[in-house]
Amino acid sequence: MKPFSMRACLLAGVAVLFTWPFAQADQMQPAAPFVMGYANRLSCVPGEEVSFHLSASTDSVGLVIERVGGKRVKVFEKAKIACATQPIPDRASSDGCHWPAAYTLKIPDDWTSGYYEATLTAGEGKKAARGTLFFVVRSANPGKNSPILLQLTTNTYNAYTNWGGHSLYAYHDRDGLQGHRVSFDRPLRSQFRTWELPFVQWAEANGYALDYAVNSDLEFHPEILKHYRLVLSVGHDEYWSSPMRDHLEKYIAGGGNVAFFSGNTCCWQVRSEDRGRALTCWKQWYNTDPLYRQGDQKLLSTLWSHHLVERPENQLTGVGFLWGGYHRSHGQFMDGPGSFRVHRPDHWIFAGTGLKRNQRFGGKDTIVGYECDGCEMKWVDGLPFPTHGDGSPKSFTILASCPARWAPGDCYWYDRFPKDREGAAVLGIYTQGGTVMTAGTTDWSHGLRGNDPAVVRITRNILDRLSK
């Protein structure tokens, strides 16, 4: 989430609806030298083909592909791939670039599941231009090499990417406006390095094998879920479609476990379009969503916690942004501790940590930071209990918390939100078929990067217990 002024909101509501359809001229090219591109798939399995759609100021480009995990491992290299400068359509952000494929690769059978980064090079020497794109390789035999599936937050990558001029945010938009549709068929800005990579590096260094997928695989390949004991969400997992939720909630009801080492999770409902190559989200302008006037308001592309949708993310994760907010970000609790205060130290999640009631952990690496999720709480004898009035499951237990608050500008995103209400980042757990653990913060993995003893032990406890 990003705060914005009310004036920007009002401008966006007009411009998104009336300006975009009439602007059709191609956009200006970046200054030479340049190279950029995207893959036609977010994920694939060995034996399938992935195509690279490229544009460059040179007539050929170099391509190096590496698997990025505990180590960077080069798996493929090719020089002098024929290329050309491709037009950038005015609506590239929403409708895609429609560039031809410059190169198509069949994924070798020996490529392991993981995050793969392709580095593109145009020109030579110090004046060469470089760009990157990514794709994910799923396991050809789900669950064979790992009982743990990490699904990457690729919907959020796309939502924040403003390449082509627009994203789902106004703060970095070409015209200061907010889009309502974003395409994967354009160069994307990955957020993998910020949150998921520190988790992956720690996991692989400590003997935890992971299989990989992307957000949309929960929607279009839900059959893979049954092969795993534990599904992970790490970092900033903000944008979810209804089929994604349906399939993961069915998995949990059937006994599958989920660990949300993430925050601001499942905040906005999106609708997949173009067979998963685009996302629609009208956000705070829910009454301009075409579904609003059709009466099908359960699928409105707005906050999951909105009173018209009536499906708060708490029902899935145990917590939500409505009772969370920011910590050390957006002007909220900028001098806050950045750490969790323990409430129930005897829970198995804290085994081996030595933590006691009211003791804090994670502050060295500010594991409570940026965006946080919480639940409505009541305090009895110094201990917090969920009220369950916000959708948190009846078995949800609050294990630790830290204060958080919405930024004032965000209150306009929800038409029944009381201003200045304090929330919290909540670390908690519930069982409803399977077990669901939630960290309630985007920045949990930073504690793994910093090797915080408590964060490391808690993470081990969760992975060891829930992956069995």
What is the predicted function of each stretch?
Residues 9-20:
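Bacterial N-terminal signal peptides
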Residues 121, 151-155, 213-217, 233-236, ...:
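Active-site-proximal beta-strand/loop segments in catalytic clefts of secreted hydrolases
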Residues 26-34:
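Proline/serine/threonine-rich low-complexity linkers at boundaries of modular beta-sandwich domains
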Residues 38-59, 65-71, 78-124, 131-134:
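Ligand-binding face of N-terminal immunoglobulin V-set domains in extracellular IgSF glycoproteins
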Residues 275-461, 465-466:
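Glycine-rich, aromatic-lined ligand/substrate-binding cores of catalytic
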Residues 55-71, 79-81, 127-224, 460:
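Aromatic-Pro/Gly-enriched surface loop or interdomain linker
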Residues 1-11:
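Bacterial N-terminal signal peptides that target proteins for export
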Residues 82-83, 87-97, 102-106, 110-112, ...:
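Helical hinge/lid and interdomain linker segments adjacent to catalytic or ligand-binding clefts
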